[in-house]
Amino acid sequence: MAEKQDIEQSDVQAIIDVFSQDKNLAPRCRKVGALLKDRLYDISSYYWDYWISMGKFPELQDSENVENARTKTAAFVGRRLGDIEGAEWSKFLTRQIMDSCQRGIPLENVNAASTRTNAFTLKLLGEVYGVEHDDYQDLASAILTATGLELSIMAMCYTEYHANQNATRRREQSAQFESDIGIAA
C-alpha cells in the first residue's frame, strides 16, 4: 500500500505566509526567543510532562527517550522563535505530526499539549521579562500567534493524512470489488 506520507512544503509555506503578513511577527518572536533562551528546556519539559502524565506511551517511561525528546523539542522551539518565517522548524513539525498521525495520536491531544504549553510560556515570559514592560502585550501576542500558526499546520497535516488514508481505503475497496467480480487481472 503506497501512500503519500509527506506534506507539501508549499502548503505549509502558504500557511506561514498568511501569518507572516504581520511584518512585526518575526522580530517579536526573535525577541521572545532571546528572552526565553535559557528557559527553552523548561518549556519543552512542560510540554512532555503532559504526554508522560497520560501514561499511554511506554517509550516515555525510559528516561533517555524523555531526555532526547525534551532536548529536540527545546531546539525546535528555539528554531521556531528564531525564524518563524523560515521552513526548517516547520519541516520538523510536519514530520512529528505525521508520525503522530501514523501512531493514531488524536489531534485533540496534540492541541491540548501545545495550548497548555502556551500558557506556561506566557507565564515564563512574565517572570523573565515582566508584564510591566510596554511591549509585553506585543510579545505575548507573538507567542499566541506563533502557536496559532503551529496549530494551523498541525490541523493541515492531520487533514492531509486522513484524506490520504481515505483515498487509499477507496482504492483498496475498488480493487477488491473488481477482483470479486472478476474484472481485475
Regions found by a protein language model. Give the residues of each.
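Core of compact, soluble alpha-helical bundle domains
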Residues: 1-95, 115, 122-185
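Elongated alpha-helical scaffolds
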Residues: 98-125
